[in-house]
Amino acid sequence: MENLGFAHYNLRAEWSVLEQLRDFYVEVVGLQLGPRPPFASRGFWLYAGAQDVLHLSEARPGEPREANVSGSFDHVAFRCRGLAACEQRLAARGIAVRRSGVPGTGIVQLFLRDPLGNGVELQFEEPEG
């Protein structure tokens, strides 16, 4: 087998929360709502450019989840542009952010949480100034 790279990740939640997640990932993270195949269940596909990177799938109320689902995931990272504008937008929305960096690379990282508490990293490679 040859691994060709990352395809997407999927978050499952009840419909009321799924709409909040959609709004967060579109309005805060900057993904775009795009086409989704006509599955029997409701959901959204969010895109970064032409690539679907996040699938939001409706979970039935009380749907059982594997115990390991909540215990091992730390965060997902997105490569971004526009650090200053992003920091201003996050501050204006009152979103808690932890700013960090990758030593020796010049990469700036902004860590935040989505409405379900999942970790999100916004990664910027551009020089500051």
Task: List each model region and its residues.
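Mid-chain, well-packed structural core segment of small domains
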Residues: 69-90
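Short acidic/glycine-enriched loop/turn segments that link adjacent beta-strands
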Residues: 39-43, 72, 104-108
